[in-house]
């Protein structure tokens, strides 16, 4: 958007110095290596910003990118191998000198997927594969200048991974009955150092 470009023409200084804009960008491309192999690349980039003169600022954004390889083993079996990246972050700022501060937070994921589809016949398809996701979460970090009365704080980052395997069967028995069933097994792992707490029934910490 171009809203903030018009703010500069305002005669009111409290409006003139404000910030107001957002953007969204999508991009896609593909390349066929040969009859059995095709590469797909896609991405999304978005950002929103709001600022009130020299008082307050707030912004957030998303970035995602996907690289996918499609491979045909035969006329009945094909696979998709996907590498997916996503990042969400936001920033809050207070520009008042005596209480100035900046807050940052983000969630970043890396995802690897391997999917297969086997066509037993025109009405019977089996899908199976693996899914691995690694999470990095930065809950919050507060920074401030030396003259600010705000104390700096950094919440510990958290890292974890999910892994899953699945298989499903889609079977069109006739023109009125379509049967779909499957099985999925998943697990979650937490990595890295950090403080972890146990709580009792009253919500109080009983161990660290």
Regions inferred by a protein language model and the residue ranges of each:
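Short secondary-structure transition/capping segments
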Residues: 8-9, 52-53, 92, 192-193
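Outer-membrane beta-barrel domain signature, strongest for Gram-negative TonB-dependent receptors
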Residues: 20-138
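Signature of Gram-negative outer-membrane beta-barrel scaffolds
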Residues: 127-208
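Short, structured coil/loop segments at alpha-helix boundaries
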Residues: 11-12, 34, 74, 174
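Surface-exposed beta-strand-turn/loop segments characteristic
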Residues: 2-19
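Surface-exposed loop/turn and secondary-structure junction residues enriched for glycine/proline
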Residues: 5-9, 23-25, 80, 166
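General secondary-structure edge motif
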Residues: 9-10, 49, 96-97, 104, ...
